[in-house]
Amino acid sequence: MRRIAFVNEKGGTCKTTLCVNTAAWIAVQRGKRVLIADLDTQGHAGKALGVDVRGISPTIREVLLGTSQSVKDVARPTAVPGLDLLPANKDLASFPVDVALSPDRADRLCRRLDEVPEGSWDAVLIDAPPSVSLVTENVLRAATEVVLPVGLTYLALDGCAEILASLDVLRAETGRAPRV
């Protein structure tokens, strides 16, 4: 299953818009089953799909903490045929503190996606937060491919450079990194 992450340290680079529209296109035009994993505390991927994420439970946070059912059980259908959502909201902000002492804290998303039964989805598109953080590290470790939306501004390019540097560190530490 392809795992495509939309990542940039800079906010406002259209990560969420590109992620949601790409997922909808793959589902509708290609007839594939797609899951959007929203890893941004703003929950904008869900909001863009018409899902009220305020107070929604369970979310990606419970999946990452292992206190909830599986990814497949938490994923919710959307109005777009073939497109499901693993929602996020502000509760995700506590995740780094919740797992601070856990040795597998950077591999939670990868491990949970590895548990997804074969054939559940053809692709998982991951909407990353606008930061370099433990959540972003989880995203990069789980992804097989990375899309770096970049506006033609200094700060957007700087954010892109930070993500590329993070990928270099990941490659040095693990011997692998997602394709950009």
Language model features by range: what are they?
Residues 1-180:
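P-loop NTP-binding core
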